[in-house]
């Protein structure tokens, strides 16, 4: 089965992290930002990925395009229960919004993508959506990379695997896709700490003073936000800047043909800035679909910087990282969009998650599966 190929990548990477994970727990201290990927990396079984994607991305399309005939292909798709007439009327209005969507309008993100398992299956479902709308596989593969799939992770090596998996999936449908330049919105979250801010004066050549100053101010704001970004990952709250303006500012580089000690490394700085702009825009966007298996870690086990950030921005859900991610993913998802997550089940009954339950009460739950123990062989006795 094709799905097994990406599963192998994920399992190999999880077992690669076994020793670093054991070492992090054995030291009996706070988990550092370097250790968080190994400690929280947990590969999502294929059937759970399919269930989440089919009932979020798949449902979004099917509810707006009921005659597309796709849901018959989805083993884990659950039909909606019969609703009261008042609810049916509200749903009919929402589905008008879905019906107006074209395939390229649907942006999906996995903000904790790991090795990319969720993104790869989402690619398959998106391909079915595009084909049902009359696209060829070749054109659809390019469009999915450019318009639909987004992913983030704090782990650089996981990013490399996810990028590889997504591009190989694209090549499955378009054998020439690696021959040209293609946009792939899959990123390892990077920090701005190493940016040489003295180089900013070399950018914005040819722009008028108002635009140039606005771009510089916004870029400095982004760099400030992304300081120590690997401590926080996708829970970082990024403002929605004028991303086109920032890209034009960085592209308009001018050192007057002079090479000085001060200008050495400007091209490297431009490359770093463009990467940070891409990451920032991805974190600031709203998505029609958010699907992820978030990290499970008590915030008290994190270092002081993570603790302080969570208390400042997610104080109501500071018990565990998975609760923080429920709130964050809710904020990343458009109104009437779909959010699919695997979480531990404590949020349903423990007093420390009471505020989270209030957030969830304001969201319509389409379906929920209580898996019980041993859904993940690696988590002894835990329930999701």
Residue ranges and their predicted role:
Residues 48, 275, 324-328:
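Well-ordered alpha-helical segments embedded in enzymatic catalytic cores
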Residues 102-109, 118-285, 289:
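Class I S-adenosyl-L-methionine-dependent methyltransferase module
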Residues 43, 267-274, 316-324:
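Conserved phosphate-coordination/catalytic loops
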Residues 120, 127, 131, 154, ...:
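Signature of N6-adenine DNA methyltransferases within the class I
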Residues 1-144, 150, 158, 294, ...:
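Class I S-adenosyl-L-methionine
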């Amino acid at each position: 089965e094709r799905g097994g190929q990406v599963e192998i990548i994920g399992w190999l990477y999880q077992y690669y992290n076994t020793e670093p994970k054991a070492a992090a727990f054995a030291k009996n201290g706070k988990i550092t930002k370097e250790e968080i990927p190994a400690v929280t990396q947990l590969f999502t079984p294929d059937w759970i990925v399919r269930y989440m994607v089919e009932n979020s991305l798949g449902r979004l399309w099917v509810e707006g395009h009921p005659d597309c005939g796709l849901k018959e292909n989805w083993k884990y798709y659950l039909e909606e229960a019969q609703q009261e007439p008042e609810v049916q009327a509200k749903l009919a209005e929402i589905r008008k919004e879905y019906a107006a969507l074209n395939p390229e309008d649907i942006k999906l993100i996995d903000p904790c993508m790991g090795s990319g398992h969720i993104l790869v299956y989402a690619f398959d479902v998106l391909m079915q959506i595009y084909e049902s709308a009359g696209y060829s596989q070749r054109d659809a593969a390019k469009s999915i990379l450019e318009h639909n799939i987004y992913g983030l992770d704090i782990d650089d090596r996981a990013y490399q695997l996810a990028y590889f998996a997504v591009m190989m999936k694209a090549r499955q449908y378009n054998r020439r896709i690696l021959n040209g330049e293609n946009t792939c919105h899959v990123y390892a979250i990077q920090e701005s700490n190493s940016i040489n801010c003295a180089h900013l004066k070399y950018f914005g050549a040819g722009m008028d003073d108002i635009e140039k100053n606005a771009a510089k101010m916004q870029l400095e704001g982004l760099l400030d936000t992304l300081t120590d970004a690997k401590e926080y990952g996708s829970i970082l709250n990024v403002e929605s800047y004028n991303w086109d303006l920032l890209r034009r500012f960085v592209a308009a580089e001018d050192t007057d043909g002079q090479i000085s000690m001060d200008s050495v490394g400007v091209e490297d700085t431009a490359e770093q800035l463009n990467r940070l702009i891409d990451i920032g825009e991805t974190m600031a966007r709203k998505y029609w679909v958010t699907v992820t298996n978030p990290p499970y870690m008590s915030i008290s086990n994190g270092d002081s910087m993570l603790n302080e950030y969570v208390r400042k921005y997610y104080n109501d859900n500071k018990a565990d990282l998975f609760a923080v991610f429920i709130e964050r993913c809710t904020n990343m998802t458009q109104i009437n969009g779909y959010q699919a997550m695997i979480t531990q089940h404590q949020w349903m009954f423990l007093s420390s998650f009471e505020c989270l339950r209030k957030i969830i009460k304001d969201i319509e739950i389409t379906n929920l599966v209580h898996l019980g123990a041993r859904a993940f062989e690696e988590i002894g006795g835990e329930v999701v």
